[in-house]
Curated annotation (Swiss-Prot):
One of its GO terms (cellular component) is eukaryotic 48S preinitiation complex. The lineage of its organism: Eukaryota, Fungi, Dikarya, Ascomycota, Pezizomycotina. InterPro entries: eIF3e, eIF3e_N, PCI_dom, WH_DNA-bd_sf. Gene3D superfamilies: 1.25.40.570. This is Eukaryotic translation initiation factor 3 subunit E.
Length: 452
């Protein structure tokens, strides 16, 4: 019988003391996605992530070494040499760096001379005015009228790649664009498109980046039509590269959210990179705050998100996805409030999401309060404030604003410290529809689980 005796308060307290709450830094480290993201990014795209991480790392030397290892095989010779000096506490650099710098400058001169004629022609308005959408006809025109050869066209590709390796991303974007206008080599054109996308990202030219995202997407669908594995790999890369404009350029938000939820891409996320659910969840939650957002579209995105988070919970979870699960799958408001606190720590330590942290917390509080108000007739302001992570005064202001902004039928009893919700009675017909919807949704989830 002794085994069935519940633990004493002292035992519970000592157990809690043995497992104190994690600090913000511990939570951030536990859910750091950098090791998962790096394999899907070009080394130049990894660099901004390392720069961001170095701001929160105590071991500067280790981070400098990581940057050195990342960039030592590029042609950013001066920057790499400076990193070497920092690592080795030296004012001088080995001869190999001097030699490599001379080689890089010589190659730049070579590529510049090799491509000088064709780049000059492509800057001539009269020549460009005679170009058409037919690449074969363009090459024939340039060959007959100006002596342009296939090698000259290919030199644009080589020069663009070299400029990219040197960190001259603006020059690289222009050269790769010029190459793509003329080349009929599909593999090189595809490579140039990826290179131009990276260059647009690294120069924060978000309009240009989104144009390249669409071009890469189209290339994946057409060039790799008969190669499902190749499509999966390329879609995985595109998803990761798209994170840069996703949270830095507002017009990209809707386009990329729709892309990620499309059958081919949500399947890629579930199969290859489930950690992207963090970014999809953050995008959907913060979409709630956007005044121009269509309510029906938002509700559909939220339903799709809940479905995927429910399905993939065994494969991937973090405080952001756990918040969605707690609120919309388990209807556990205490757990949702706890996960929201952890989610804020994760967001502020994530390169892509740090700027969205405040918007996420604001939107999440709205979602908690909306869900809570839907299932309660009388709400204690103090209790709801606690669930939102606010003190009573802040909570009261929050609820007043919520009632005003959402125009819900409710009134505040300041004397009792409660909110009284006026839920209109639902017709029997409507109740049957809602229950049927719920049963159908559960059937879909079970079917998907069985199919896996």
């Amino acid at each position: 019988m002794a085994a069935n005796v519940p633990p004493s308060a002292e035992t519970l307290l000592s157990g809690a003391a043995a497992h104190p709450p994690k600090t913000a830094e511990e939570i951030a480290n536990q859910y750091d996605l950098l090791p998962k993201l790096i394999p899907y990014l070009d080394r130049h795209l990894v660099f901004p992530l390392l720069e961001f991480s170095s701001g929160s790392q105590e071991d500067d030397k280790e981070m400098i070494r990581a940057k050195y290892e990342l960039l030592k095989h590029t042609n950013m010779t001066d920057y790499v040499a400076n990193l070497w000096k920092e690592i080795n506490d030296s004012d001088t650099i080995p001869d190999e760096f001097v030699k490599k710098r001379e080689e890089v400058l010589a190659k730049l001169q070579h590529y510049q001379e090799q491509s000088a004629k064709i780049t000059e022609l492509l800057q001539d308005e009269d020549v460009v005015g005679n170009l058409r959408s037919d690449k074969v006809a363009n090459l024939k025109f340039l060959e007959e009228e100006h002596g342009v050869t296939a090698d000259m066209v290919n030199s644009l590709f080589d020069y663009g790649r070299f400029q990219y390796s040197c960190g001259s991303y603006g020059n690289a974007a222009e050269l790769l664009y010029q190459f793509r206008v003329l080349s009929t080599d599909n593999d090189k054109v595809a490579s140039a498109t990826w290179g131009k996308l990276a260059s647009e990202i690294l120069t924060t030219s978000w309009d240009g980046a989104m144009e390249e995202v669409q071009k890469v997407k189209d290339s994946i669908e057409t060039r790799l039509f008969n190669n499902p594995l190749g499509q999966l790999q390329n879609r995985s890369w595109l998803i990761h590269w798209s994170l840069f404009p996703f949270f830095n350029y507002d017009p990209a938000r809707d386009v990329l959210t729709d892309l990620f939820f499309s059958p081919a891409y949500i399947n890629t996320i579930q199969t290859s990179c489930p950690w992207i659910l963090r970014y999809l969840a953050a995008a959907v939650i913060t979409n709630r705050n956007r005044a121009h957002k269509n309510s029906n579209v938002y509700q559909k995105q939220l339903k799709d998100l809940i479905r995927v988070v429910r399905q993939e919970g065994y494969e991937y979870s973090d405080p952001i996805t756990d918040f969605v699960k707690a609120l919309y799958v388990d209807f556990d408001f205490e757990e949702a409030q706890k996960k929201l606190g952890e989610a804020e720590d994760v967001l502020r330590s994530d390169f892509f999401l740090v700027s969205a942290a405040d918007a996420f917390v604001e939107a999440a509080r709205h979602l908690i309060s909306e869900s809570y108000c839907k299932i309660h007739q009388r709400i204690d302001i103090k209790d709801l404030s606690t669930r939102l992570g606010l003190n009573q005064d802040e909570g009261e202001k929050w609820i007043v604003n919520l009632i005003r902004d959402t125009r819900v039928d409710a009134k505040i009893d300041y004397k009792e410290g409660t909110v009284i919700m006026n839920h209109p009675p639902q017709s029997v017909y409507q109740q049957v529809i809602e229950k049927t919807k719920g049963a159908f949704f559960r059937t879909q989830v079970l079917s998907a689980a069985v199919a896996k």
